[in-house]
């Protein structure tokens, strides 16, 4: 089962990824915790350029897709074939939100690049964390973007959530309550998957 957590920086997403993977491991599910951009030595080597270097938006998109291809083929797909639960911090919907709605790159171009590279994959479950507001932390290129850019990304995420039925939108309510809601949704999805596989 492939689970992805999405959201803008400062939404608490990375914290919830760690909490969810701990819950799954405690419940006896073999779990792989990973992130994007990154997850392999090659993808991690591109991460710094993607997040920190002043490069053209299309060049950044191509780096992101390159990192994703390597990550998907070397980490995600093998783990899924072994029957493990993969919990990933960001995946394709981040690219649609940031590069599509933020950088204004045509969405179909982004999808076509993924299709051509063999990683146009919909996760089994995507949890989109929407906070009350963006925290401008200034740690990377995206966090330093103007408020208008970040507003476009947020709007993009909301539009994407309406386009894809496997995305569950979660309003952040503090670490504890948000974690409880995530666990409840994941438990339901796992039960649903187990039931369908028994038919």
Curated annotation (Swiss-Prot):
One Gene Ontology cellular component: cytosol
GO biological process: dTDP biosynthetic process; dTTP biosynthetic process; dUDP biosynthetic process
UniProt cross-references to Gene3D superfamilies, sorted A to Z: P-loop containing nucleotide triphosphate hydrolases
Highest taxon of the lineage: Bacteria
Keyword ATP-binding in annotation: yes
Binding site for ATP: 7-14
Enzyme class at the top of the EC tree: transferase
Assigned keywords, A-Z: ATP-binding, Kinase, Nucleotide biosynthesis, Nucleotide-binding, Transferase
Keyword ATP-binding: yes
Regions that span the bilayer: none
Pfam families given in the database record: Thymidylate_kin
EC assignment: 2.7.4.9
Record GO terms (molecular function): ATP binding; dTMP kinase activity
Catalyzed reaction equations: dTMP + ATP = dTDP + ADP
Family: Belongs to the thymidylate kinase family.
Function: Phosphorylation of dTMP to form dTDP in both de novo and salvage pathways of dTTP synthesis.
Name this polypeptide is given: Thymidylate kinase
């Amino acid at each position: 089962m492939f689970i992805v957590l999405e959201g803008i920086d400062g939404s608490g997403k990375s914290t919830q990824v760690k909490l969810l993977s701990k819950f799954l491991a405690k419940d006896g599910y073999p779990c792989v915790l990973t992130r994007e951009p990154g997850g392999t030595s090659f993808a991690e080597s591109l991460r710094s350029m993607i997040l920190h270097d002043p490069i053209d938006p299309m060049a950044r998109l191509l780096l992101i897709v390159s990192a994703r291809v390597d990550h998907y083929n070397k980490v995600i797909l093998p783990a899924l074939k072994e029957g493990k639960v993969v919990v990933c911090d960001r995946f394709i919907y981040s690219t649609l939100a940031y590069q599509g709605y933020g950088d204004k790159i045509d969405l179909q171009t982004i999808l076509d690049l993924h299709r051509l590279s063999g990683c146009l994959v919909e996760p089994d479950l995507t949890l989109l964390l929407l906070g009350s507001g963006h925290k401008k932390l200034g740690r990377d290129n995206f966090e330093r973007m103007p408020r208008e850019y970040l507003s476009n990304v947020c709007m993009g995420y909301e539009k994407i959530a309406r386009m894809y039925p496997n995305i569950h939108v979660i309003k952040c309510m503090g670490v504890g309550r948000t974690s409880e809601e995530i666990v409840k949704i994941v438990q339901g999805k796992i039960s649903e998957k187990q039931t369908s596989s028994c038919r």
